[in-house]
């Protein structure tokens, strides 16, 4: 049987807001926007640690608080950043990634996190066999729900094995976009239907899916994640689905209302003193998150 996550989420896909990774202003922005689904990376929390270190965060740390105030939180393994981002160029081995997995497990267990955890999908750097080693090992050592990630290296036979093994499976949308740039939407739709037809109770996650059209086409999936809500404060421009506008053009009354809400959270609930510039950044990001939530609701149903 699956995790029953779709029952928890009602009957349609829920988009998890990614990219905050424990930052106070991002936490306040998303809370003020009344979003209820998050995805964060454990990368910075385990990078410089050893497996036997103390991974405990303060009880009021954002990572621990968001684990309880949201309907669902997904923890990414940070493996992509380790392999292709900040850690690019470092030689990874079975031993080094075993240590990474040990640290990930210790971090989750010591902080009593209830989040769903993404596996160490190392197919591209170590191979499919090694990915299965980590997949089976993590299922044995960690009680949390887990997401297993399909990559092209697995092949369709490997996908069948993953479906049989998994309760919750993810498709990497950025990978599909790169490998099949002209047909990735159709390929995603084919794969999601294939997975559901083979195992109707399985949960499906669309990893890194920023495409609202794809979210609508695959609304029967369980979850997706996106950093689109941060594009406005990162690039200055934001698309609400009808028109593209600069964040400086947001209505002043809406900015003031959201600024007040963000300040109440940061100064009142969190006990922080942030600069006016940071608070304005948070208010704008929060409004972008609200717009995204509205877009997802129109495309795929309630995001409550």
Predicted feature residues:
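Glycine-rich phosphate-binding active-site loops on the catalytic face of alpha/beta enzymes
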Residues: 173-175, 210-249, 283, 291, ...
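Histidine/lysine/aspartate-rich catalytic loop segments that bind and position anionic ligands
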Residues: 148-179
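Glycine-rich adenosine-cofactor-binding loop
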Residues: 148-150, 172, 185-191, 195-216, ...
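Short beta-strand/loop segments at the ligand-binding rim of alpha/beta enzyme cores
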Residues: 10-14, 70, 75, 140-147, ...
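Non-catalytic, usually N-terminal nucleic-acid engagement modules in DNA/RNA processing proteins
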Residues: 1-140, 268, 296-304
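Active-site-adjacent beta->alpha loops and helix N-cap segments on the catalytic face
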Residues: 49-63, 123-138, 155-157, 176-194, ...
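Glycine-enriched alpha-helix->loop->beta-strand junction motifs that scaffold or abut catalytic
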Residues: 33-38, 69-70, 141-144, 163-170, ...
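Catalytic cores of alpha/beta
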Residues: 89-96, 154-164, 209-223, 269, ...
């Amino acid at each position: 049987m699956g995790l029953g996550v779709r029952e928890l989420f009602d009957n349609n896909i829920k988009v998890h807001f990614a990219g905050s990774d424990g930052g106070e202003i991002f936490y306040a922005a998303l809370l003020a926007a009344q979003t209820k689904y998050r995805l964060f990376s454990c990368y910075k929390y385990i990078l410089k640690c050893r497996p036997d270190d103390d991974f405990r965060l303060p009880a009021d740390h954002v990572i621990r608080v968001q684990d309880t105030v949201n309907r669902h939180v997904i923890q990414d393994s940070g493996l992509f950043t380790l392999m292709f981002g900040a850690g690019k160029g470092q030689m990874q081995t079975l031993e080094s990634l075993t240590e990474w997995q040990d640290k990930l497990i210790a971090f989750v267990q010591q902080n009593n996190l209830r989040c769903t955890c993404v596996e160490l999908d190392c197919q591209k750097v170590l191979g499919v066999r090694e990915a299965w080693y980590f997949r089976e090992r993590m299922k044995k050592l960690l009680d949390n729900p887990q997401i297993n990630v399909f990559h092209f290296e697995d092949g369709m036979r490997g996908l069948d094995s993953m479906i049989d093994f998994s309760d919750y499976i993810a498709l990497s949308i950025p990978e599909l976009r790169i490998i099949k740039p002209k047909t990735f939407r159709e390929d995603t739709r084919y794969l999601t239907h294939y997975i559901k037809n083979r195992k109707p109770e399985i949960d499906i996650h669309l990893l890194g899916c920023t495409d609202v059209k794809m979210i609508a086409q695959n609304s029967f999936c369980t979850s997706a994640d996106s950093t689109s809500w941060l594009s406005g404060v990162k690039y200055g421009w934001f698309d609400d689905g009808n028109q593209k506008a600069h964040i400086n053009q947001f209505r002043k009354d809406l900015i003031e209302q959201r600024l007040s809400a963000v300040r109440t959270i940061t100064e009142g609930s969190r006990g922080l003193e942030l600069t006016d510039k940071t608070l304005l950044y948070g208010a704008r990001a929060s409004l972008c998150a609200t717009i995204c939530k509205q877009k997802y609701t129109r495309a795929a149903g309630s995001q409550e």
